[in-house]
């Protein structure tokens, strides 16, 4: 029941997450890890990545531009009042406000390594950049991948606050394969598939089921269990496929 689809008639939730800052713990001083100001800190000139996304970049720059006002408000406001202020600042854009935000982004531009949408993960994993405006799922994925390179990454939500976003499935009205689109969405919303998708991407599924809740709290789940590829509709594995699984396990060390 969101304002863009009050009766849930046109969209199906897919994934959700947060926007925050991913950083290299060996290169960024802990004292700098607290607010959005890290993205404007010239101590890390040419090592900062910013999202080539108007929604995210303008949102963050707006909060940064009004950081002193928000800092004072946080001392006396209730959580609801503070949230309402953030919402007003970021959703009601005036010409004066936009000019102020543009100034902050132009100032930041001189110290950036790059603007990016997807390549930032690799830049962080390879140690080319130290600071990245990141979506939570990308951060989860990159933190794990970076360990193989001996690089330690972490992720935090700045103290001024951030936003929670949702990705949704929709079917264009001019689609020629509506039935297939529905089947695909149903497939992706199956709890078992949603679990495996979540494990692969690092993002949190919007599908809620007891199985998913149990999975998210079970530390012993094998993330590399691919036996589902060989199961029939009832979850059974034939003798032929079982032999194939054992062959790949023995011959190639693949953990099916």
Predicted stretch roles:
Residues 102-106, 149-170:
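Periplasmic-binding protein-like
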Residues 1-125:
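Extracytoplasmic ligand-binding site segments that recognize negatively charged/polar headgroups
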């Amino acid at each position: 029941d969101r304002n863009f689809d009050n009766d849930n008639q046109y969209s199906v939730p897919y994934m959700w997450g947060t926007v925050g800052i991913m950083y290299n713990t060996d290169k960024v001083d802990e004292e700098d890890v607290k607010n959005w100001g890290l993205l404007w800190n010239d101590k890390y000139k040419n090592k900062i990545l910013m999202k080539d996304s108007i929604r995210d970049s303008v949102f963050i720059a707006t909060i940064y531009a009004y950081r002193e006002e928000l800092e004072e408000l946080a001392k006396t406001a209730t959580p609801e009042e503070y949230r309402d202020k953030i919402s007003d600042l970021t959703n009601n854009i005036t010409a004066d406000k936009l000019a102020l935000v543009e100034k902050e982004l132009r100032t930041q531009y001189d110290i950036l390594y790059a603007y990016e949408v997807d390549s930032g993960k690799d830049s962080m994993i390879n140690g080319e950049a130290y600071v990245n405006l990141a979506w939570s799922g990308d951060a989860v994925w990159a933190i794990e991948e970076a360990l193989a390179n001996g690089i330690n990454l972490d992720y935090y939500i700045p103290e001024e606050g951030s936003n929670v976003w949702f990705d949704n499935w929709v079917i264009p009205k001019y689609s020629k394969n509506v039935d297939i689109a529905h089947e695909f969405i149903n497939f992706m919303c199956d709890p078992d598939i949603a679990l495996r998708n979540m494990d692969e991407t690092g993002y949190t599924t919007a599908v809620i089921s007891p199985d998913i809740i149990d999975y998210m709290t079970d530390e012993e789940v094998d993330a590399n269990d691919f036996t589902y590829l060989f199961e029939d509709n009832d979850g059974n594995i034939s003798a032929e496929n079982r032999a194939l699984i054992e062959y790949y396990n023995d011959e190639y060390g693949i953990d099916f």
